[in-house]
A protein has these predicted regions:
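Conserved N-terminal beta1-alpha1 strand-loop-helix module at the mouth
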Residues: 1-71, 75-79, 169, 189-212
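Hydrophobic faces of well-ordered beta-strands that scaffold small-molecule active sites
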Residues: 5-10, 33-35, 60-65, 84-85, ...
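Active-site beta-loop-alpha junctions enriched in small/polar residues
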Residues: 9-13, 36-40, 65-69, 89, ...
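Alpha-helical segments flanking ligand/cofactor-binding loops in enzyme cores
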Residues: 19-23, 74, 95, 115-118, ...
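Glycine-enriched alpha-helix->loop->beta-strand junction motifs that scaffold or abut catalytic
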Residues: 26-31, 77-84, 98-105, 119-126, ...
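Glycine/Thr-rich beta-alpha phosphate-binding loop at enzyme active sites
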Residues: 31-39, 72, 77-79, 100, ...
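Catalytic cores of alpha/beta
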Residues: 69-79, 112-120, 137, 157-175
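Glycine-rich phosphate-binding active-site loops on the catalytic face of alpha/beta enzymes
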Residues: 84-93, 126-135, 171-191
């Protein structure tokens, strides 16, 4: 996650649209992708996507996001999730992921939550909603006493050099990007070529910025 520095996240009820979006991001250089758990049949879609990705792009790390309970985490792990992202800190979810040695990325909004999540085994912590809880300045404040923390802001991050500079210069480990990266054309259809090029440009921006601050 730190290598490409961005994590695209997406969900659609149409399996083919999911595949095209994932492929566009992959072709743009993304090697980690978060499928968000937003629909009733999301786990069935994920299962098919995982099998497809294993055959078509075997170096893609495909995980699941928007998980809020241990049972759902276990279900997606059984379907092959490489990591689990949550908007909350949940002790039972941490136990499930740790038992299966699956990376668990909980969502936190305070320094106390971040420390608690790390005590539960979280190597990376999601800051959510990042813009609303203080943005880049919040990251700077956290990394003062917690210089070892790996923070992934999500919510309010833009695939633009100026915006990315603020997050990474503040100390972000990586960033989550959704609808601002996975964009549509004027007709309302997903613009897969634009998604590919925007992913490529965003990764290049992020890597350049991180190389300057590390």
């Amino acid at each position: 996650m730190g290598e490409t520095a961005i994590i695209p996240l997406f969900y659609h009820q149409d399996i083919e649209i999911n595949k095209k979006v994932i492929k566009a991001c992959y072709d743009g250089g993304a090697r980690v992708f978060e499928f968000t758990n937003r629909g009733i049949q999301a786990h069935h879609l994920f299962s098919e996507l995982k099998r497809w990705a294993s055959e078509e792009m075997d170096d893609l790390i495909l995980g699941v996001g928007s998980i809020v309970d241990a049972g759902t985490a276990a279900l997606f792990i059984q379907e092959g999730a490489d990591f689990v992202v949550s908007p909350i800190v949940n002790v039972e979810m941490a136990k499930v992921c740790n038992r299966r040695k699956i990376a668990w990325i909980p969502g936190c909004a305070t320094l106390s939550e971040i420390n608690f999540a790390e005590e539960l085994g979280a190597e990376i912590v999601k800051l959510f909603p990042a813009a609303q809880i203080g943005g880049p300045d919040f990251i700077k404040s956290v990394l003062g006493p917690n210089h070892w923390s790996s923070l992934m802001p999500s919510g309010g991050v833009l695939p633009e050099q100026e915006n990315l500079e603020k997050w990474f210069k503040a100390g972000a480990y990586c960033v989550g990007l959704g609808s601002k990266l996975i964009i549509k054309n004027k007709n309302g259809d997903y613009d897969y070529e634009k998604i590919r090029t925007l992913t490529k440009d965003t990764i290049n921006f992020a890597r350049d910025i991180k190389s300057q601050v590390e």
